[in-house]
Structures are given as structure tokens and as C-alpha cells.
Amino acid sequence: MRPTSGCSKDDTIQKQNRRHNTVDNKQEKLPLSIEIFLNKQINKISFDTIRSKQNCRLKEIYCRLKIRCRLKKKFIKSLSKKIISYHFISFHTIVVLLLLPPFSHLLVLVYPSVFTTAFYHQKWALRLNPCLPTYFFHRQRQCVTLLIRNANENMRARRVNSVMLTKPKQFLFLLEFITLFIFTYCL
């Protein structure tokens, strides 16, 4: 029995198809090095675009923060000056009242407490400078490092300001305390 012509035709068609497929696969496949290079380029482009967008957003946030910090600093400086000036007026009025004859014997007891409250008021006035809106920590996680950097800078600046403010006033308070103490005991 001879094999039918249909079977032989099918076999030849399948063989031809296989040959075509192998040729197509060989043409489509790129070398591994080129594929890796292209993938890297695609990833780099996408990463660069994302990073540039993030940088723009961070710059915007940073600018807004700077403006808000400046406004807050101005307001807080004026407020702290008012508190300190008000405190000095009240402090000196108390001292003048205590120098009057009926209250002079209470001066030694009251003066140290007034002295300590003066420092607490002053520290409170200095601590009123928050500089950083806390809700930014919740809103922008990318901005946390930037905010921490700003916070550290502000803390350094605040320490310098506090040292500059407290030292001369400490000296004045001590002088007043010594003079009044001597004055009361001499009398």
C-alpha cells in the first residue's frame, strides 16, 4: 500500500511552517546585551522623569515652607518682644512696690520667685518659635528629611538667639537682686 498524497502534503506543510517559525524567531530575538541595555535605558528614562517631578514638588513645598516660616518668625518675634517688654514693666513695678515701707520686709521672700518667673517667661517667649508645620510630616513623606534638616538649622539658630538674649538679662537680674538684698539688710 502506498501512502496517500494528502498525508505527505500535510507533512511537508508542517515542515515548512517549522522552518518559517525558526527563521522568524531568529530574526525577532535580539542579543542579550542589547536587550539588557534597552531595558536599562527605559528604566532610566522613567526613573529620571519621576525623580524630576519629585524634585519639582519638593522645591515647591520647600518654597512654601520658607515663606510660612518667615511669616511665623515675624509674628512670633513681635509677640515675644511684647511678652518680654510686658514682663519687664510688671517686674519693675513689683520691685518698686516692694521697696515701699510696708512691703519692704517681704522683699527677700518674694524677689527670688519673681526672679525665677522672669526666666520662665523669657524661655516661653523663645520657645514660641515652632518653625515647622507638623501636618507636612503626614502629608509628604518625601519631605521629612528636608524638614528635619530645616529643624536642625532652626534649633541651632534658636540656641544662638537664646544665649544672646539670656546672658545680659541674667547679669542685670543678678545685679538688681544683689543691690536690693544689700539695700534691705543695710536698712
Curated annotation (Swiss-Prot):
It is found in: Cytoplasm; Nucleus membrane. It comes from Schizosaccharomyces pombe (strain 972 / ATCC 24843). The chain crosses the membrane at residues 83-105, 163-183. Has a role in meiosis. The lineage of its organism: Eukaryota, Fungi, Dikarya, Ascomycota, Taphrinomycotina. Keywords: Cytoplasm, Meiosis, Membrane, Nucleus, Transmembrane, Transmembrane helix. GO terms for biological process: meiotic cell cycle. The gene is mug155. This is Meiotically up-regulated gene 155 protein. Signal peptide: none annotated. GO terms for cellular component: cytoplasm; nuclear membrane.
